[in-house]
Amino acid sequence: PTNTFDTYDSVGEREDLSDVIYSISPTDTPFISSAAKTRATAVLHEWQTDALAAASTSNAVIEGDEATLDAVSPTTRLSNSSQIMDKTVVITGTQEAVDKAGRASELAYQIAKKAKELKRDMEATITGNQAEVTGSASAARKLGSLGAWVATNDDLGASGSSGGAGNTARTDGTQRVFTEAALKSVIKSVWNAGGDPSMIMVGPFNKQKLSGFTGNSTRFDAGADATLYTSVDVYASDFGQLQVVPNRFSRDRDAYVLDMNYWGIAFLRDFTMHELSKTGDSEKRQLLVEATLESRNEGASGLVADLTTS
């Protein structure tokens, strides 16, 4: 009717803004969560590894003979540089004071968000293919990541070459389809070297590839009769069962076979936050972590590299 006053004419209506902020950004970090945690006390973190002599079938001694003195092998000394990673937040006093939807404090909300981002950065860095950089006054230190350590038991594409000792990144080769034969070969190689792998870490595309393998696998532990399971969560190899773990932040072209007893994260400074100097009407915070990857014996793990990702 004429002169009907409706919402299109109204001026004073409040906006309808939900008081919840929705985010689906993933925050799971399977490698960091599974690795042992240890302490670093210097920017260059060092440790030692050792190995037994090969088993011999000729170990027979003549009765009454003088003992022959065996050679003694020294330990191997390894190292990795600590890397500083940070996230910063600066919020004006006005933004902190105004009434906001979804959070009472902008500063607290942004700090929580940056903390999750920092953890994601650390997972992506450690599971990547980055060579160690010792750093200088003008260049940041960088840790040698997973791809720069695993070399003994790797299966690479054509023209690919192994990394080594954390200070040499692997050279990527020609990408090829992920096959069960390649996976089984690497698992066998790891076992022969003395490893007892418990995890297969893959990206999303090759997690689905692995689920199509026809070998022994566990597709579910329990569930309703009407549920169809098409994924593999546990791979039953000839040398034990391995949990299949998808990782959103590792390189999708890499499939790692891991004995997590031989990987550690050494923290020089654990995740921390501190205030930055106040230079105006704002609050500043820095979140940081300083840590490195400890490869306790890379021969206990393996890698099927250079896989297709689409």
Question: Which residues make up each language-model segment?
Answer:
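Flexible, glycine/threonine- and acidic-rich loop/arm segments that mediate assembly and lattice contacts
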Residues: P1-S310
